[in-house]
């Protein structure tokens, strides 16, 4: 069985408050994009085997694919007898939800392989126990996510061309949340909501992340200055900044200019909402 795990971007991200359980109450509009990882799941009578083609990622118990598989088999009370192979395209520490998407696709694939043993509501509960973003990826469409992210309401989002830019460094999501309360807006950086068609783009996590990583603020500002760009925003906790393009044919030219003017080592990817 072959499955595809899409990346996501946050089109809107608001932090409402810090909760007593340590999580943050959020409201975010997330949308899957055409960039995606690939998973293969097949029966394996000798037990559970997991491999990933990215040597920088753990293939151990802390990998979200492994956690998802363990959670699924624990819930259905079966011995895990599958081989899962993960081929990565989504960069790590990028704010694109790659690990959460891989976990959700693992749950969906295993549930299909085992005859739909878990109901959709039970699958959602299992997903929420793995990570806050995992329930969103079960929906396989754009959605408003509330609570700590586990309350998911599908939404309609128009298709748009986008360009993703990411520097070599990543950003820790937990660190970004921890810094949010005491962070301040940097002078000269525009944090105001931007319009892109019917959408209003804004991200509350830009404030703490830009304080530490001023380059991301500069990259966002640079993108907004490009005539082919309608809006630009950091996705999630970063370090990816995405641009909504007026024309999909401009992606390569913008990426080339960004590498020339900002950082020759930038990772760039043209994608579609």
Task: Annotate each PLM feature.
Residues 70, 74, 108, 112, ...:
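Short, well-ordered alpha-helices that flank and scaffold nucleotide-derived cofactor binding pockets
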Residues 1-94, 111-121, 148, 166:
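ATP-binding N-lobe of GHMP and related small-molecule kinases
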Residues 85-114, 132, 231-245:
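Glycine/serine-rich anion-binding loops at beta->alpha junctions
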Residues 44-46, 157, 228, 237:
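Short strand-connecting beta-turns/loops that link adjacent beta-strands
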Residues 2-4, 12-28, 116-231, 244-273:
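ATP-dependent small-molecule kinase catalytic core of the GHMP/sugar-kinase superfamily
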Residues 45-58, 106, 128, 194-202:
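Short, basic/glycine-rich phosphate-binding loops at helix/coil junctions
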